[in-house]
Amino acid sequence: MLTTGMFLLEGSLLSPNPGLIFWTAVTFLLLLLLLKKLAWGPILSALEEREKSIQSAIDRANSAKDDAEKLLSKNKDAMNKAEVEADRIIKEGKEYAEKMRNEIVTKAQEEAKKIAAQAKAEIEQEKQQALNALRDEVATLAVKGAEKIIRMNLDAEKHKAVVEGMLEDLSTKRN
């Protein structure tokens, strides 16, 4: 206890002691020189190397970003061109389809007119044939009737009966 009390009486660690200050400064400077010679250079070179690698990574990232932006811009341009081309192709396809539809409709109408004209011509021809056949038959019947009338030289009642009979024959032949 006496030693602690003496230590307290002589001075505390907080009071300045010139010898202690000198040796602390010398030790600090020696340690500083030693660190500068042995550690400071490698630490600085490691920091510089690290800074260079970080800067290189940043430059590569910026370059990659620029390349990606250029590629994105090219892709957008290509997409826009593709959309324009697709729209043009669709428009041309629609125009071609409309043109083909119009041609088909026109051809179908012309064909229908031709078929109708042919049908009318055939109907007219068959009508004429039927009329000619009817005329021939009526003429034949009239001649036969006249022949019968002349041969019989009949009175009016018999004449009327012969004509009615011929008309009945004519109507049954028509059906």
Swiss-Prot record:
GO CC: one term? proton-transporting ATP synthase complex
Q: Which gene encodes it?
A: atpF
Cellular location(s): Cell inner membrane
Name of the protein this chain belongs to:
ATP synthase subunit b
The protein's matches in Gene3D superfamilies, at most eight in alphabetical order, are given as: F1F0 ATP synthase subunit B, membrane domain
SUPFAM superfamilies named in the record: F1F0 ATP synthase subunit B, membrane domain (SSF81573)
For this chain, one GO molecular function annotation is: proton-transporting ATPase activity, rotational mechanism
What's the subunit arrangement here? F-type ATPases have 2 components, F(1) - the catalytic core - and F(0) - the membrane proton channel. F(1) has five subunits: alpha(3), beta(3), gamma(1), delta(1), epsilon(1). F(0) has four main subunits: a(1), b(2) and c(10-14). The alpha and beta chains form an alternating ring which encloses part of the gamma chain. F(1) is attached to F(0) by a central stalk formed by the gamma and epsilon chains, while a peripheral stalk is formed by the delta and b chains.
The region annotated as signal peptide is none
Q: Which family is it part of?
A: Belongs to the ATPase B chain family.
Q: Which NCBIfam families match?
A: ATP_synt_b, PRK14472.1
Q: What is its main location?
A: membrane
The regions listed as transmembrane in this protein's record are 13-33
Q: What does this protein do?
A: F(1)F(0) ATP synthase produces ATP from ADP in the presence of a proton or sodium gradient. F-type ATPases consist of two structural domains, F(1) containing the extramembraneous catalytic core and F(0) containing the membrane proton channel, linked together by a central stalk and a peripheral stalk. During catalysis, ATP synthesis in the catalytic domain of F(1) is coupled via a rotary mechanism of the central stalk subunits to proton translocation. Component of the F(0) channel, it forms part of the peripheral stalk, linking F(1) to F(0).
**Alphabetical UniProt keywords:** ATP synthesis, Cell inner membrane, Cell membrane, CF(0), Hydrogen ion transport, Ion transport, Membrane, Transmembrane, Transmembrane helix, Transport
Its membrane topology: Single-pass membrane protein
